[in-house]
C-alpha cells in the first residue's frame, strides 16, 4: 500500500506572519487541507509531520483520517529528520510538502506508475536562475548540483528539483539511518539520500511535473498567486457543471460554496460558504454562509451568515443577516436582521429591523401578505401577523394583529408664508 508523508513542521518565516505557513488559506481553505484531500484520493495511509504551532495545525486537521507526528527539532531537524520519526508502513512512500496546495491527485498517481527505487519530481523552468539543477541522463537522475557549484554546461540545464519524492520502503529503511547532520546547518537533509542512492547504483527516475501544481507557497505574493489559480479552478468546475458567470475573472467563489440547478452569477460577486439553488446573484453582490433557493439577489446586495432565502427577491442595497425569508420582496435600501418573514410580504424602501438594543439582539417576525411602507422602523422584539399594512414613515414597537393598519406619524403642520418670513423676502 502507498504511504504518504506530508512535511508541515516549518515556520515559514518568509511569509512574515504569526500564522503557521500551512494554515494560510486559499479560497477559504487552508493549504494543508487541500493537500490532505488530494492525498486521500490515493491512499488512507497518511502521516503529517508537524512542529510549529502544533496545536493549531492539529486542530485544523483533526477531522481528517490522518496520523499526526510531532517532529523533535532539537534531535532531528531538517526534512530528513522529519522522516526519522515516522514509522515506514507502506511498500512505497510518497513525500509531499505542506506548502503545495495546488497539487493534484492524478499527477501524483503517475509517481507510482514508474518502476524505480526513487522517483524524483523535476520542473522545467524558462529561467532556473537561483535554483539547483538536476542532471538527468536517459530519464535517470545522476546528481543535484547547487547553482554556485554548477559548471557552464550544468547552468544551461532547465530542470530543477520540485521537492516531491517517491521511495521504495526498503530504500528508506536502509538509508534513513545513514543520514548525517554534519553540515553547516546541523540538519538532516532528505536530498542526501538521493546522493547516497545514486552512488550505490540504484535507480532514480525523474518525472517532469507541472510548475503550476508543484511550486511551493513561500511568501504572501506566492499565496495571492496560488489563490488566483485555485479560484480559477473552482469557477471553471462550476461553469463546466452549468453555472453561468458574467466576467468570471471578476468573481470570487470559495472552496466551500456549491451550486445546484440553473444558476447565474453576475460580475464582481463574492460567494463564500453558501449554497445557491436555481437562483441568480446579480452584479456586485456578496453572499456569505447563506442558502439561496429559487431567488434573485442584487445587484449590490449583501446576504450575511445564517440567512436562508426561498422564492425571494432582494434588490439593490439590501442587507440580510441571520434571517429566514420565504417568498418576499425587498427591492431596495433595507436592513433585515434576525428576521422571519413569510410569503407575499413586501418590504418598502428604507425599512429597518432594529434588532439590537446595545446589549442583546432580538427577532422580528412578519407573517404573510404584509405590506410595509417605505422608511419604516421595526423595533424588535416584535411580531406582525398576516394581512397587515404599515404606513410609510412608521415606527413599530408593538405587536400588530392580523388584518390591521399600523400608522405612527406626527400630524403634518403647514405654516403659510414661513419661507418668506424666515429669509426676510417678499412674496
UniProtKB/Swiss-Prot annotation:
Essential cofactor(s): Mg(2+)
Residue ranges, annotated region (N-acetyltransferase): 242-427
Organism superkingdom: Bacteria
Alphabetic keyword roster: Acyltransferase, Cell shape, Cell wall biogenesis/degradation, Cytoplasm, Magnesium, Metal-binding, Multifunctional enzyme, Nucleotidyltransferase, Peptidoglycan synthesis, Repeat, Transferase
UniProt pathway: Nucleotide-sugar biosynthesis; UDP-N-acetyl-alpha-D-glucosamine biosynthesis; N-acetyl-alpha-D-glucosamine 1-phosphate from alpha-D-glucosamine 6-phosphate (route II): step 2/2; Nucleotide-sugar biosynthesis; UDP-N-acetyl-alpha-D-glucosamine biosynthesis; UDP-N-acetyl-alpha-D-glucosamine from N-acetyl-alpha-D-glucosamine 1-phosphate: step 1/1; Bacterial outer membrane biogenesis; LPS lipid A biosynthesis
Amino acids binding Mg(2+): 99, 218
Pfam families in the record: Hexapep, NTP_transf_3
InterPro entries named among the record's database cross-references: Bifunctional_GlmU (IPR005882), GlmU-like (IPR050065), GlmU_C_LbH (IPR038009), Hexapep (IPR001451), Hexapep_transf_CS (IPR018357), MobA-like_NTP_Trfase (IPR025877), Nucleotide-diphossugar_trans (IPR029044), Trimer_LpxA-like_sf (IPR011004)
EC numbers: 2.7.7.23, 2.3.1.157
GO biological processes: cell morphogenesis; cell wall organization; lipid A biosynthetic process; peptidoglycan biosynthetic process; regulation of cell shape; UDP-N-acetylglucosamine biosynthetic process
Record-listed acetyl-CoA binding positions: 349, 355-356, 374, 392, 409
Pyrophosphorylase: annotated segments: 1-220
Localization in the cell: Cytoplasm
Active site: 332
Cellular component GO terms held in the UniProt record: cytoplasm; membrane
Complexes and interactors: Homotrimer.
Function: Catalyzes the last two sequential reactions in the de novo biosynthetic pathway for UDP-N-acetylglucosamine (UDP-GlcNAc). The C-terminal domain catalyzes the transfer of acetyl group from acetyl coenzyme A to glucosamine-1-phosphate (GlcN-1-P) to produce N-acetylglucosamine-1-phosphate (GlcNAc-1-P), which is converted into UDP-GlcNAc by the transfer of uridine 5-monophosphate (from uridine 5-triphosphate), a reaction catalyzed by the N-terminal domain.
NCBIfam families: glmU, PRK14359.1
Designated name of the protein: Bifunctional protein GlmU
Gene symbol of the encoding locus: glmU
Amino acid at each position: 500500500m502507498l504511504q504518504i508523508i506530508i512535511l508541515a513542521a516549518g515556520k515559514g518565516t518568509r511569509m512574515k506572519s504569526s500564522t503557521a505557513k500551512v494554515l494560510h488559506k486559499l479560497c477559504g481553505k487552508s493549504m494543508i487541507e487541500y493537500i490532505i484531500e488530494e492525498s486521500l484520493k490515493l491512499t488512507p495511509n497518511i502521516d503529517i509531520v508537524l512542529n510549529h504551532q502544533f496545536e493549531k495545525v492539529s486542530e485544523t486537521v483533526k477531522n481528517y483520517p490522518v496520523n499526526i507526528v510531532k517532529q523533535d527539532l532539537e534531535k532531528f531537524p531538517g526534512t530528513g529528520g522529519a522522516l526519522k520519526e515516522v514509522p515506514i508502513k507502506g511498500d512505497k512512500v510518497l513525500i509531499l510538502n505542506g506548502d503545495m496546495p495546488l497539487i493534484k491527485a492524478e499527477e501524483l498517481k503517475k509517481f507510482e506508475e514508474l518502476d524505480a527505487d526513487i522517483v524524483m519530481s523535476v520542473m522545467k523552468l524558462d529561467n532556473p536562475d537561483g535554483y539547483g539543477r538536476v542532471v538527468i541522463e536517459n530519464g535517470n537522475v545522476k546528481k543535484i548540483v547547487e547553482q554556485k557549484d554548477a559548471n557552464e554546461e550544468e547552468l544551461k540545464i532547465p530542470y530543477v528539483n520540485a521537492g516531491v519524492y517517491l521511495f521504495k520502503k526498503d530504500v528508506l529503511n536502509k538509508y534513513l539511518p545513514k543520514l548525517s547532520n554534519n553540515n553547516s546547518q546541523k540538519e538532516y537533509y532528505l536530498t542526501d539520500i538521493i546522493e547516497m542512492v545514486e552512488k550505490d547504483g540504484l535507480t532514480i527516475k525523474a518525472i517532469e511535473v507541472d510548475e503550476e501544481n508543484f511550486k511551493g507557497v513561500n511568501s504572501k505574493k506566492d499565496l495571492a498567486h496560488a489563490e488566483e489559480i485555485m479560484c480559477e479552478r473552482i469557477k471553471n468546475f462550476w461553469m463546466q457543471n452549468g453555472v453561468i458567470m458574467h466576467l468570471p475573472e471578476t468573481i470570487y467563489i470559495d472552496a466551500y460554496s456549491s451550486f445546484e440547478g440553473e444558476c447565474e452569477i453576475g460580475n464582481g460577486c463574492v460567494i463564500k460558504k453558501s449554497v445557491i439553488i436555481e437562483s441568480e446573484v446579480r452584479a456586485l453582490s456578496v453572499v456569505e454562509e447563506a442558502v439561496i433557493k429559487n431567488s434573485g439577489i442584487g445587484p449590490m446586495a449583501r446576504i450575511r451568515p445564517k440567512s436562508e432565502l426561498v422564492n425571494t427577491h432582494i434588490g439593490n442595497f439590501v442587507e440580510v443577516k441571520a434571517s429566514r425569508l420565504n417568498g418576499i420582496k425587498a427591492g431596495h435600501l433595507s436592513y433585515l436582521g434576525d428576521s422571519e418573514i413569510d410569503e407575499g410580504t413586501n418590504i418598502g424602501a428604507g425599512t429597518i429591523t432594529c434588532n439590537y438594543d446595545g446589549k442583546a439582539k432580538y427577532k422580528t417576525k412578519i407573517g404573510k401578505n404584509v405590506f410595509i411602507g417605505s422608511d419604516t422602523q421595526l423595533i424588535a422584539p416584535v411580531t406582525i401577523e398576516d394581512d397587515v399594512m404599515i404606513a410609510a414613515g412608521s415606527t413599530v414597537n408593538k405587536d400588530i394583529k392580523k388584518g390591521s393598519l399600523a400608522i405612527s406619524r406626527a400630524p403634518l403642520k403647514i405654516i403659510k408664508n414661513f419661507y418668506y418670513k424666515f429669509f426676510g423676502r417678499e412674496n
